[in-house]
Structures are given as C-alpha cells and as structure tokens.
C-alpha cells in the first residue's frame, strides 16, 4: 500500500485525493501494472483505453494553446496519443497514473459533479463512484489497510 500511495501522491494530476485514486486503481486493476496487456483494450493500473488517451493528448494541447485545437493539431495529438498507447509507456505505473488522473480531471472540469465525472469516466457503470467514495472515506482513516479495498471493492 505504501508504494502505490507514493506513486499516486507523486503522479496524481486530478483534484481528487489520493485515497480516491488508490480505490479507483484497485477497482480497475487490483494494482496489476500490466493489467490488460495482450488481453483487451484497457491497459495498465488505471485501465486506459485508446480514446481516453487521445482525449487527454487533445486536452493537453487545448490547455497549452488556450483554445480549441484545429483539425491538424487534433490529428497530431491523436497520432502522439496512439504512439503512447501502443508503447510500453502505457504500462509504466507513473505514466499510467498521470494519464488516468488527467483523464479523470478532464471529466471533472466538464461535468457538474464529481459523481457525474466518475460516471462519464467509467461509461455505463452507474455504481462506479458509489463503490469508490465510501471505500476512499474508510481508507482515509486507515491508509495502510488493504483489507478495506478487498471488502469495499472486492478481491
């Protein structure tokens, strides 16, 4: 737990506290760095998918430029995102947490509530945030207790 907590502390790009991100990572991958490798489209600790990575790369450009990107800039951002997604960098724990939390922050910035942001982040899983929130609240009181994750989210 201490190692994942330190990784989250150093790489979280969202406004969400580290306990929320730790619970989210556990729910997504059970802390398995190579989750999804050669199995499906969701990859790494935060189970990032290609379109999510593309959205982050495009959003980065919008923030840098202070405006919407042109079609050419969007295509360049998508090409860079695809290169990242297809590389082993997607499985680097630090990079995966950075891009996953950037993606979460994108939705936090777009949606009216944190709950809606998590719902949009996850897609159709209505219960996603309702599982993460109570787990994170318990973990905040006992930060090194992995049992909280196992009981709150599952094995």
Task: Go through each PLM region and give its residues.
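Residue-level detector of well-ordered alpha-helical segments, enriched
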Residues: 16-21, 41-44, 113, 117
């Amino acid at each position: 737990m201490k190692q994942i907590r330190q990784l989250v502390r150093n790489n979280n790009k969202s406004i969400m506290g580290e306990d929320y991100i730790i619970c989210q990572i556990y729910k997504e991958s059970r802390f398995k760095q190579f989750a999804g490798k050669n199995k499906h489209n969701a990859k790494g600790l935060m189970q990032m998918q290609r379109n999510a990575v593309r959205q982050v790369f495009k959003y980065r450009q919008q923030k840098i430029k202070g405006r919407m990107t042109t079609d050419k800039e969007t295509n360049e951002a998508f090409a860079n995102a695809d290169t990242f997604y297809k590389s082993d960098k997607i499985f680097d724990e630090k990079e995966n947490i950075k891009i996953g939390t950037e993606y979460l922050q994108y939705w936090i910035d777009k949606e009216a509530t944190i709950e809606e942001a998590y719902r949009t982040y996850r897609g159709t899983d209505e219960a996603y945030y309702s599982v993460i929130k109570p787990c994170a609240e318990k973990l905040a009181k006992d930060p090194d207790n992995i049992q909280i994750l196992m009981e709150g989210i599952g094995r």
